[in-house]
Amino acid sequence: LIILDRPYVSDLLADTISKNKIPVIKLNEVFIPNESTINLKKVDDLLIELEKGNSPILFNSENGLNILSKYAPNHYLTTVTDILKNKVTFRKTLSRHYTDFFFTEVSLKELEELDPSALPFPIIVKPVIGYSSIGVHRIDKVEEYKETIKLLKFEMEVTSSEYPIEVINNQSFIIEKLIEGDEYAVDVYFTEDGEPVILNLFKRMFRHEKDMSDRIYYTSKQVINESLNKIQEFLRTISSFFALKSAPIHIEIRINNDQIVPIEVNPLRFAGIGTNELGVHAYGVNACEYFFKQEKPDWENIVNQMDDSIYSFCCAEIDTSIDCKQVVSINHEAFKLNFGEILEYRPMKVNESSTFAVIFHKSPDLNENIRLLNLDLNQYITLKERVFV
């Protein structure tokens, strides 16, 4: 069973659902390509499927997770979701393993009023319940604190109408110690025995130390070879901490001198807005299909057959200072000229979310990604003219 919700269902996901006859619960009138070919179920059927206990369940979006607490408040998956989705509860559960890791929960009012001189800079501030990189800020020193919190408050005001409180809680925040190291994003499911099965392994790129955007993720033979085995072992530890069984997750981690520290875990879904489909282009793994068939990628064989290219996902977003509803048009053709080899270009509905395009692309090295990270996307966006009376 797959639960589909806004903001986005890709053609590939819809085709995978149709081909594999996966039952669907549709929420909030989300647009589903070729909807007539899929098996739609009622929301009430969710509890029936959960009680059966033998059917894999996946969400395509954070937005739909709140139906678990409504229709199955006492189910194991609801409990696990609540723990993993709440960053404070997540950190508390991990604290026996990461004993020296600083974190604290505060309200927005407390963020504005607290004395920052007592904080162990550099720190990260982010919503306790959040999505993507919205509201995530790195603060390196006391002098940066107040201006950053002002910006955070503004972001929360802008996004409060775009996401429900179950997706982004704009009143409760976590302050935590900065996690150093290279960042990876992993799509994985856990078998009935709690064994992790890695379906996707991506590396994240940043423009600079304070960049928290999701603009570039990439993968390659080197990325997989350098990290697969150690991440697999780490996921076994995570599985034991949270008793993860028969559950898919998207986990973000950092690796520094072979120490792996989780940043956050997104339960019951894979990388959002189509990011997980980079695996199809890079090494032929359709995460959704593998999960529902409970198949395991043969990573040794996959790596042996891969070329030496860099396979990347670019998430082109409208700046948080711009109201999406003020966007008139995007010059997609001009934007496309920034890519050497486009594998797939997906324009998005700009007035519904901050993402105006997602692009899967291929390059011989990381130079194209570095250039894309530094590209000013505002030049491709046309806004409504302001009329002053």
Please place each PLM-identified region on the residue numbering.
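Conserved N-proximal alpha/beta basic substrate-recognition cap immediately N-terminal to
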Residues: E29-A118, P364-D376
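Conserved ATP-binding module of the ATP-grasp superfamily
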Residues: D100, V142-E180, F241, R386-V387
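Glycine-rich phosphate-binding loop of ATP-grasp-fold ATP-dependent ligases
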Residues: I123-L152, E183-D187, R207-V223
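Short acidic-glycine loop/turn motifs at beta-strand connectors
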Residues: D140, F190-P196, I255-D258
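Conserved metal-phosphate-binding beta-hairpin within the catalytic cores
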Residues: S239-G274, N304-S309, C315-D323
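Peripheral (often C-terminal) accessory segments that flank ATP-dependent C-N-forming ligase machineries
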Residues: F292-V389
